[in-house]
Amino acid sequence: MSCPTSAGVLQTHQLLNDNSILIRDEIYGEELVSEPVLVELLQSAEVQRLQGICQHGVTGFLGITPRVTRLEHSVGAFILVRRVGAALDEQVAALLHDISHTTLSHVIDHALSKPGEGSYHEVHKARYLKTTRLPDIVAKHGISQKVFEEELFPLVEMPSPQLCADRLDYALRDAVSFGKLAMEDAQKVVSSLRAFPSATTARRLLVLDDAEVALTLSRAYTTTDKDVWSNPAHIDMYERTGRVIGELVEAGSVEDKVLWQVSDAEFWTMLRQAANPEQRRAIERLETEGVPEDDGLELPHCAKIRTLDPDVWPRGEKQPAPLSIVLPTWGTERQQYILSRTQHR
């Protein structure tokens, strides 16, 4: 039995023997994993790499926001679909849904993505997977290569503003870490979680069985968006960091392949070493000045405005319905928030 190792802010992993791993998550509790494909994936270098990557890029790396990691989020999404009874392939898809994320996460979108392009890690996912052992690992265990297409698994990915494991885990993990949602309320959300009509039907949905719990979650999600995800000051730091990275990659001073090979800390050291004096001053300003005053900063047109409208399936009802239908006041509140953020562009 090994000692527990940190996967991030709210999660540890412990290898009990060669055949099982105990995950302890402050939101979800304990989860014992013994399926061979999951144990092998959890121990793989490709999955473990995500421990060194902050969900929130430069703000996480510099300690401005909590250092929530891509690893704890990926494992969290896996736990959520597992808890509602998802098939093994959907559990694998959840675990691997962020596997191609680069160092500094979405900062790289501001550095290297072309206008109108999707997130850099999604556009280059196939390219990255070819350099890994992951396709061979899942094939060895009889799992389809479709697990690398998480959009095929409705419990893992659904269009916004619906609930899915990816969206729900980062909502809970970030809202708790940033103090926007009490741990007790986060755990009530998990207790309220269900799959409709079941976890294995073709048109399956993640739903909550309590409208008040869904409302608490949705409001915390909106608050986290306003203060963190679409905070113009945080986005400004992403853009400034992205400019330096883009210049260094374009000049050939940093190879883009290293984006999948090093941790945030290692990459930051590489940037400092490769930077010219002007770029080094820009890096030092990011390190010393922190989050800029957001007075006068506008929300960029490319910035997502994130809201949640989870499906609610009260016990005894035949069909779920969006929270905005169950509680029309939430529909009005949500639209008012979207309008208020749009006016800041």
UniProtKB/Swiss-Prot annotation:
InterPro entries: dGTPase-like, HD/PDEase_dom, HD_domain. Pfam families: HD. Pathway: Secondary metabolite biosynthesis. Disruption phenotype: Impairs the production of cordycepin. Interacts with cns1. It comes from Cordyceps militaris (strain CM01). This is Metal-dependent phosphohydrolase cns2. Its EC number is 3.1.3.-. GO terms for molecular function: dGTPase activity. Cordycepin has antitumor, antibacterial, antifungal, antivirus, and immune regulation properties; thus, cordycepin has important value in commerce, medicine, and scientific research. SMART domains: HDc (SM00471).
